């Protein structure tokens, strides 16, 4: 652990209002200004956060010289698996790499985040790789720099009478909170691996995340596919009545990334040093999450006040936050996941996956 003798600077500006910006389409107009510190924690709490010593995954020097580089980071503060992002802010990793980072809150889906990056309304964002590969295949001009972690997507069934394996799901109905979301895409891969057709051998039904457990109990669905924190909390609410039968740490995916860091291509072209600095800051923060999950949970709890920090820490421990591949290692993972998505009929059959991986993954280390 390297201890910074000075307290890390927090960003001077924390959120940017995007609503009403000229040239933004309707989905981008849903962006709202949210101040990271005043909204989620008093100034005193932020000062206390800054006191925690900093551990680093890399010993690289700051890539950005002179005045801090302003970076607009699209972040909605809902996914515990991207806890490294607020940790990078509140524990000073952005400041150590000479970055002045603002959080932009998106009111909608990952697609809006990608549109924001491609349209130069944001500089960077993080989300599930399974959600990004289809838009990237379709031509969204965003580059991937590093994975953030593995794990966080789970499949549950009733303990007493539900299916016990993915193969048992043939002819069953799986509940999801989004038909096009990462849980549906990932478990479509596992179904395909098990010799089932995810389009015809199972049915998918969409429910609000907080209704999935009730739908299972009413017999409307036979299994639940969801991501943390909702998946974890659903299992807790069930009080032992459901069991996890698979996750995105199953099989080959035990050593693969779940979430990734993406940047707009024009930023990589115009300021590669800023992209390197951002990537190294996030990788340092993921190391912090892996080594200090209780502290990372305390940071993230300011963004999800309805969930106890102890529960958030338990979720983080169940993920693989020490796994953050970059460069060729990330390119191999993208190729593997894209290959699986093609087999599950999510990626087009004629897409050249090697070209796709080479196009979207950049080397920053």
Predicted regions and their residues:
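Short, glycine-/small- and polar/acidic-enriched structural segments
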Residues: 37-197, 205-206, 222-228, 244-245, ...
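N-terminal secretory signal peptides
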Residues: 1-14, 18-27
């Amino acid at each position: 652990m390297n201890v910074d003798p000075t307290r890390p600077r927090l960003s001077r500006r924390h959120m940017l209002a995007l609503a009403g910006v000229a040239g933004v389409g309707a989905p981008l107009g849903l962006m709202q200004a949210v101040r990271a510190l005043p909204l989620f924690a008093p100034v005193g709490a932020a000062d206390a956060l800054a006191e925690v010593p900093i551990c680093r995954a890399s010993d690289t020097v700051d890539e950005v010289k002179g005045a801090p580089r302003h970076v607009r980071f699209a972040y909605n503060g809902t996914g515990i698996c991207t806890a490294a992002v607020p940790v990078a802010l509140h524990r000073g990793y952005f400041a150590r790499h000479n970055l002045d980072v603002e959080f932009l809150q998106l009111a909608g889906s990952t697609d809006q985040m990608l549109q924001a990056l491609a349209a130069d309304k944001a500089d960077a964002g993080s989300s599930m790789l399974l959600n990004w590969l289809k838009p990237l295949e379709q031509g969204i001009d965003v580059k991937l720099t590093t994975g953030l972690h593995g794990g966080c997507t789970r499949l549950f069934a009733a303990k007493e009478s539900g299916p016990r394996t993915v193969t048992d799901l043939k002819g069953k109905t799986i509940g999801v909170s989004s038909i096009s979301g990462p849980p549906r895409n990932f478990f479509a891969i596992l179904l395909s691996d098990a010799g089932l057709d995810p389009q015809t051998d199972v049915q998918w039904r969409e429910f609000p995340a907080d209704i999935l457990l009730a739908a299972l109990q009413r017999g409307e669905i036979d299994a639940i596919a969801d991501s943390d924190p909702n998946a974890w909390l659903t299992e807790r609410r069930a009080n032992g009545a459901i069991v996890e039968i698979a996750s995105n740490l199953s099989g080959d995916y035990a050593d693969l990334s779940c979430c990734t860091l993406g940047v707009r291509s024009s930023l990589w072209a115009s300021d590669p040093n800023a992209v390197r600095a951002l990537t190294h800051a996030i990788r340092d923060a993921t190391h912090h999450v892996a080594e200090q999950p209780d502290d990372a949970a305390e940071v993230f709890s300011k963004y999800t006040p309805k969930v106890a920090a102890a529960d958030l820490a338990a979720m983080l421990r169940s993920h693989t936050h020490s796994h953050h591949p970059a460069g060729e290692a990330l390119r191999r993972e993208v190729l593997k996941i894209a290959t699986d998505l093609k087999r599950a009929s999510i990626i087009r059959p004629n897409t050249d996956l090697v070209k796709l991986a080479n196009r979207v993954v950049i080397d920053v280390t």
